[in-house]
Swiss-Prot record:
UniProt KW Cell inner membrane keyword: no
Family, per entry: Belongs to the universal ribosomal protein uS7 family.
Main localization of the protein described in the UniProt heading: plastid
Stored InterPro entries: Ribosomal_uS7 (IPR000235), Ribosomal_uS7_bac/org-type (IPR005717), Ribosomal_uS7_CS (IPR020606), Ribosomal_uS7_dom (IPR023798), Ribosomal_uS7_dom_sf (IPR036823)
Cellular component terms (Gene Ontology): chloroplast; small ribosomal subunit
A GO BP annotation: translation
Superkingdom of origin: Eukaryota
Organism lineage string: Eukaryota, Viridiplantae, Streptophyta, Embryophyta, Tracheophyta
PANTHER family tied to this protein: RIBOSOMAL PROTEIN S7
Name of the featured protein: Small ribosomal subunit protein uS7c
Gene3D superfamilies found in the cross-reference section: Ribosomal protein S7 domain (1.10.455.10)
Amino acid sequence: MSRQSTVEKKIDKFDPIYHNRLVNMIVNRILKHGKKSLAYRIFYQSLKKIQQKTEKNPLIVLRQAIHKLTPKLIVKSRRVSGSTYQVPIEIKNKEGKILAIRWLLESSRKRSGRNMHFKLSYEIMDAAREKGNAIRKKEEIHKMAESNKAFAHYH
């Protein structure tokens, strides 16, 4: 019998303005060098930009974008008898959400534009309309999983 106590699951915190876990997850991924106030400012400015452009609740647009970016399958490399296979694996909802946030921020950083809140707001709006580089990344992953469906039994 193990002497170690069970680890309690970490509860995600809420952001101060919208009281939303998703917003806090995104802000923590924007964060660089511990400058959380700057990360919050960037994100809230991008939400204001979304509000101005779409005239909808920015949180609804954000949820739509994350929902459309969340992958159902992912490919992982498995080494079987000397050769490496890309094995498609179903992933959990939270893991998919984390990937979606990562892809959203990566593609917004690569985007050309004035500043981060401008680029992030346009990437979120594009993802909600099923356009943009982040959506392309998700479709690429799904296509790889579909083409390697034959190796699913190695999981």
